[in-house]
Amino acid sequence: IRCFITPDVTSQICADGHVCYTKTWCDAWCTSRGKRVDLGCAATCPTVKTGVDIKCCSTDNCNPFPTRNRP
């Protein structure tokens, strides 16, 4: 499977059986810069803390950098 990986947001080959993920959360700059984003791959969908959103998928390049709606 190919997944996008941060910080470069490049498509890389991950190990067989892995899933791609998109993890987003707010930090001190959330209101002006938007949510922080972490893209990668893992053996299983990562468990996250409260306040962190995670989306996992299992097709090539299914985790592109999320687009931000501009006001």
Swiss-Prot record:
Q: List the disulfide bonds.
A: 3-20, 14-41, 26-30, 45-56, 57-62
> Would the keyword Disulfide bond be found if you checked this record's keyword annotation?
yes
Query: Would you tell me the Gene Ontology cellular component terms?
Result: extracellular region
Name the PROSITE patterns for this protein.
Answer: SNAKE_TOXIN
- The record lists the membrane-crossing segments as none
Is the Acetylation keyword given for this protein? Answer: no
Any idea where this protein resides?
Secreted
Question: What keyword terms does UniProt attach to this protein?
Answer: Acetylcholine receptor inhibiting toxin, Disulfide bond, Ion channel impairing toxin, Neurotoxin, Postsynaptic neurotoxin, Secreted, Toxin
Spell out the InterPro entries in the cross-references.
Answer: Snake_3FTx, Snake_toxin-like_sf, Snake_toxin_con_site, Toxin_cobra-type
Tissue expression, per UniProt? Answer: Expressed by the venom gland.
> Which Pfam families does the record match to this protein?
Toxin_cobra-type
The protein's superkingdom reads Eukaryota
The cross-references to Gene3D superfamilies, in alphabetical order and at most eight, read: CD59
The record describes the protein's role as: Binds with high affinity to muscular (alpha-1-beta-1-gamma-delta/CHRNA1-CHRNB1-CHRNG-CHRND) and neuronal (alpha-7/CHRNA7) nicotinic acetylcholine receptor (nAChR) and inhibits acetylcholine from binding to the receptor, thereby impairing neuromuscular and neuronal transmission. Ranges of nAChR inhibition are in nanomolar (competitive binding with alpha-bungarotoxin gives Ki=1.66 nM on muscle nAChR and Ki=4.84 nM on alpha-7).
Protein name, as recorded:
Long neurotoxin Tx-NM3-1
